[in-house]
Amino acid sequence: MDFKNAKELLTLCQDHQLPISEIMRQREIIVGETTDESVNSRMARVLEIMKDAAFSPVKTPVKSMGGLIGGEAQKLSRHLASGKGICGNVLEKAITYAMATLETNASMGLIVASPTAGSAGIVPGLLLALQEVYDFSDEDIQKALFNAGAIGYLAMRNATVAGAVGGCQAETGVAAARAASAATELMGGTPLQCTYAASTVLMNMLGLVCDPVGGLVEYPCQNRNASGVAIALVAAEMSLAGITQLIPLDEMITIMFTVGKKLPAELRETALGGCATAPSACESCHMCG
């Protein structure tokens, strides 16, 4: 029950008539030489941590170590409660939880790297929002997380999820691709539609640079988690509507990796280019020299 690329994954789904989530769950059991109970228990713990990281800052904001972020999630939550939001219930909740998770991370709280700390808000942001709005069970969300895991595995095996190697497109891009695929399955989409959604995300985030102010995982990282979760939602919606992609996921992962390696070092997590060089941002950073 192993696979090296999306094409092989889709073949397994077709042959066994199983969703991506279950193929990935069974792979974890077999490759990890562990038990069904152990794998399920671990994913339940993952969801528990994700919830705490996403919900806590909404109630009790904490300033980040670098002083660049803190309180944004609570502002979004209050704006949603006021009835003046323009994004719609799912997206407003999703960006709130995505930004909240980055606040937790930046204040030394416990998060789940999804796939990295700098992109940790996108997957839980979208899935927790869908759970609240559509009343999905924790078990449903755990299954969706296995789906997200499959997409992350493909990116890590065949490309990268490191900003230092491939820019922010490899971090928030892959995170959003994972979220889009997971959301597509959660909402009843097919395995092929899941890969279309993931491919759509990578295409739309292609070339995004990694330029953290002060070298900290705060700004613009938090903002990009919000925009990443929005792109993931759009991609899932398109895929569920039956819109296909000309470029399959395997090719898009390769393209992302190729583009990332062509980015100059200044735009790959070194804090020597992009937003990291903005005087206004540097003046606000407690950690900047």
Spans of features found by a protein language model:
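Generic N-terminal targeting/processing segments that precede catalytic cores or assembly contacts
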Residues: 1-109, 132-133, 242, 249-289
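Glycine- and small hydrophobic-enriched segments that form the cores of compact globular domains
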Residues: 86, 113-120, 132, 143, ...
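Acidic-glycine-rich active-site phosphate/pyrophosphate-binding loop
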Residues: 88-105, 140-159, 203-212, 271
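Glycine/serine-rich anion-binding loops at beta->alpha junctions
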Residues: 103-128, 169-176
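Alpha-helical support elements that line or immediately flank enzyme active sites
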Residues: 124-135, 180-188
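Carbohydrate-binding/catalytic loop surfaces
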Residues: 165-176, 219-229
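Functionally critical mobile loop/hinge segments
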Residues: 181, 185-289
